[in-house]
């Protein structure tokens, strides 16, 4: 494999919606798509389980996740960096 092929990992930015499990966070990634027939912009979302080795990301944080090898049955992503800290309520 060449160096260019190794770096083709997808990255997504989303909000942490659950941090209850050890070393795992659930991230909600929202995207906007145009309805095929009516043309209205619709919000679609997906949840991903991401590996958080140090447990540093908390509920409400915006983080970037990177695709990786399968780490468990449902975990194929790794939390790579903090984009924005959760605001105080």
Swiss-Prot record:
It comes from Verminephrobacter eiseniae (strain EF01-2). Gene3D superfamilies: Nucleic acid-binding proteins. One of the primary rRNA binding proteins, it binds specifically to the 5'-end of 16S ribosomal RNA. The keyword Ribonucleoprotein applies. Keywords: Ribonucleoprotein, Ribosomal protein, RNA-binding, rRNA-binding. Part of the 30S ribosomal subunit. Pfam families: Ribosomal_S17. Transmembrane segments: none annotated. GO terms for biological process: translation. PANTHER family: 40S RIBOSOMAL PROTEIN S11 FAMILY MEMBER (PTHR10744), SMALL RIBOSOMAL SUBUNIT PROTEIN US17M (PTHR10744:SF1). Coiled coil: none annotated. This is Small ribosomal subunit protein uS17. One of its GO terms (molecular function) is rRNA binding. GO terms for cellular component: cytosolic small ribosomal subunit. InterPro entries: NA-bd_OB-fold (IPR012340), Ribosomal_uS17 (IPR000266), Ribosomal_uS17_bact/chlr (IPR019984), Ribosomal_uS17_CS (IPR019979). Belongs to the universal ribosomal protein uS17 family.
């Amino acid at each position: 494999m060449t160096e260019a092929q190794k770096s083709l990992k997808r990255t997504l930015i989303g909000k942490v919606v659950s941090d209850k499990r050890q070393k795992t966070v659930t991230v909600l990634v929202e995207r906007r798509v145009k309805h095929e027939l009516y043309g209205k912009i619709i919000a679609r979302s997906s949840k991903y389980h991401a590996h958080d080795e140090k447990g540093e990301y908390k509920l409400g944080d915006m983080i970037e996740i990177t695709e990786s090898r399968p780490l468990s049955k449902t975990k194929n992503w790794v939390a790579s960096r903090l984009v924005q800290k959760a605001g105080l309520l």
